[in-house]
């Protein structure tokens, strides 16, 4: 995730939450043309896959979703993507990636995929009552961060509340920031933020952390980190300039207190966006798609790239690289199995 990539709308994707059941289609119209490849999702993984597939003359079709460009469309500054020494805005980068891919033949539709049928080839991709046929699919739908949904949170996404310290920590130099969570991610984010922030307060609703011992001790022993247990966010506070703090609630007795902070990082987990696949592709215990051979999934002809697969890096540059790999894998697979 790049700078201020804090809205896990969907790194690729669909405007629907992963918890939204896929709609069954009682009446669909079939497109007679069988596409070489359909890319589901956009973002850096999807657009890069589209660029490479287009250059390979595969005539790729992308369903980018209503939030075309994914989370980066709500990213103010990207400073860690090579080639932009002065940084670049997220929407601008996504526009450039899209235009570049379209120049080489990517066809983009800003519509959501409802469901897919992978039981036989050609595969069926259903979009708002239309079913498209394709020899192969690249899934680039990403993963969405879990949010607290506390009062005042929606207004401060992008103005101080983030889900990626690696991306956004540098914006809070010499400031006080909060980290909410109790796992490895929360402890790692808190420790990372001490590089920039003057103080980091780690807030957890229990006194037992799910984090590994080494990650917890690293945070607990850092002089710039204060750990507050049995606390949860009741409400976010802000003014016209952005986040100013939060109201903390004691999970034991219900008492409240106000804490001042200009930044906050929510680290309570992610969920990959794979519901539309209907369980037809193998995933791990957390729902992330599993690669079986290079970027191919458990279903031959179905490939995946970006945060829908990535459980470790979650960066725009790694998503783009995986999108490139997926397109090359698709080209080779089509040569061997279809053309």
Located regions from the model:
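Cysteine-centered motifs
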Residues: 1-3
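Beta1-alpha1 glycine-rich phosphate/pyrophosphate-binding loop at the start
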Residues: 23, 29-30, 35-104, 175, ...
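Phosphate-coordination loops involved in phosphoryl transfer and adenosine-cofactor binding
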Residues: 34-36, 110, 173-175, 230, ...
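Residue-level detector of alpha-helix initiation sites
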Residues: 43-44, 67, 143-145, 184-185, ...
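A Rossmann-like FAD-binding core segment of flavoenzymes
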Residues: 101-127, 131-134, 195-292, 332-339
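FAD-site-proximal beta/loop scaffold in flavoenzymes
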Residues: 144, 149, 155-171, 267-318, ...
């Amino acid at each position: 995730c790049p700078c201020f990539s804090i809205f896990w709308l969907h790194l690729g994707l669909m405007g629907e939450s992963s918890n939204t059941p896929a709609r069954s289609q009682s009446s669909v119209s079939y497109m007679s043309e069988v596409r070489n490849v359909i890319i589901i999702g956009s973002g850096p993984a999807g657009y890069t896959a589209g660029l490479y597939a287009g250059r390979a003359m595969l005539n790729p079709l992308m369903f980018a979703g209503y939030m075309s460009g994914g989370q980066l469309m709500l990213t103010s500054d990207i400073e860690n993507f090579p080639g932009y020494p002065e940084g670049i805005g997220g929407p601008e980068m996504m526009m450039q990636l899209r235009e570049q891919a379209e120049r080489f033949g990517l066809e983009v539709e800003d519509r959501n995929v409802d469901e897919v049928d992978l039981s036989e080839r050609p595969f069926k991709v259903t979009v708002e009552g239309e079913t498209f046929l394709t020899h192969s699919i690249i899934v680039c739908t990403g993963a969405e961060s879990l949010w607290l949904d506390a009062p005042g949170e929606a207004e401060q996404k992008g103005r101080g509340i983030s889900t990626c310290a690696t991306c956004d920590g540098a914006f809070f130099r010499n400031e006080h920031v909060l980290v909410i969570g109790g796992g490895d991610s929360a402890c790692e984010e808190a420790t990372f933020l001490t590089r920039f922030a003057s103080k980091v307060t780690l807030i957890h609703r229990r006194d037992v952390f799910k984090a590994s011992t080494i990650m917890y001790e690293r945070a607990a022993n850092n002089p710039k980190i204060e750990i507050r247990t049995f606390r949860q966010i009741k409400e976010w506070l802000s003014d016209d300039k952005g986040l100013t703090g939060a109201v903390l609630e004691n999970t034991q007795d219900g008492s409240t207190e106000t804490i001042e902070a200009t930044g906050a990082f929510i680290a309570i987990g992610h969920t990959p966006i794979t519901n539309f696949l209907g369980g037809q592709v193998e995933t791990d215990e957390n729902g992330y798609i599993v690669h079986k051979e290079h970027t191919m999934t458990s279903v031959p002809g179905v490939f995946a790239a970006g945060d829908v697969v990535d459980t470790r890096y979650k960066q725009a540059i790694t998503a783009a690289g995986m999108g490139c790999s997926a397109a090359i894998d698709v080209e080779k697979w089509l040569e061997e199995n279809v053309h």
